[in-house]
């Protein structure tokens, strides 16, 4: 091969061989979805909520809604005379150790049936009763409350962009207003 060809190959062709690798490595797409939450939540519900079964037991789970950011997924469960709402968190979380590191991971929070109804109604009530306050100044007027080890922050960011942020167990996830309303509607439908 001539020196010209080798030089041409190095300058023009070789970078194109690495181009797909650069594209893949720069992808910021989250790899979590409602389907994965459903898959992972099954064993969480069995081991942490329903408990062991020597013979066999049946249970139902329904993935209610996932926020577009995939940070929070809501799942209804019913089995062994227990029912409720599981919130799945997926995002970066902070571990305060000697290095103070950030990791990507997931975790689930169980909210028993009565408490779930209480929580969903409280959020809806705050949004309805404080609409004027929340709409007055985007991203400036905020409402917060604590519920079962979680901190809820409600605010607006732009027209028709209600936000609900939940901080729990080193996760900080956003539950979009649309996903919240879908969760509430489908949760109420699932219990009938």
Predicted regions and their residues:
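Positively charged, low-complexity terminal tracts
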Residues: 25-192
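Bacterial Sec-dependent N-terminal signal peptides
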Residues: 1-31
């Amino acid at each position: 091969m001539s020196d010209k060809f080798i030089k041409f190959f190095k300058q023009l062709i070789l970078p194109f061989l690495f181009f797909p690798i650069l594209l893949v490595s720069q992808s910021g797409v989250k790899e979590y979805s409602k389907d994965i939450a459903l898959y992972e939540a099954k064993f969480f519900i069995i081991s942490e909520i329903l408990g062991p079964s020597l013979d066999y037991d049946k249970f139902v789970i329904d993935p209610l809604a996932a926020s577009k950011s995939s940070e929070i997924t809501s799942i209804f469960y019913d089995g062994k005379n227990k029912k409720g709402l599981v919130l799945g968190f997926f995002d970066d979380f902070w571990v305060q150790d000697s290095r103070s590191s950030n990791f990507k991971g997931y975790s689930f929070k169980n909210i028993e049936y009565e408490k779930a109804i209480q929580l969903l109604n409280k959020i809806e009530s705050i949004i309805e009763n404080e609409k004027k306050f929340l709409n007055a100044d985007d991203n400036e007027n905020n409402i917060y409350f604590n519920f079962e080890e979680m901190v809820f922050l409600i605010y607006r960011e732009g027209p028709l962009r209600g936000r609900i942020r939940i901080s729990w167990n080193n996760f900080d996830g956003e539950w979009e207003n649309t996903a919240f309303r879908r969760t509430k509607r489908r949760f109420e439908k699932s219990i009938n």
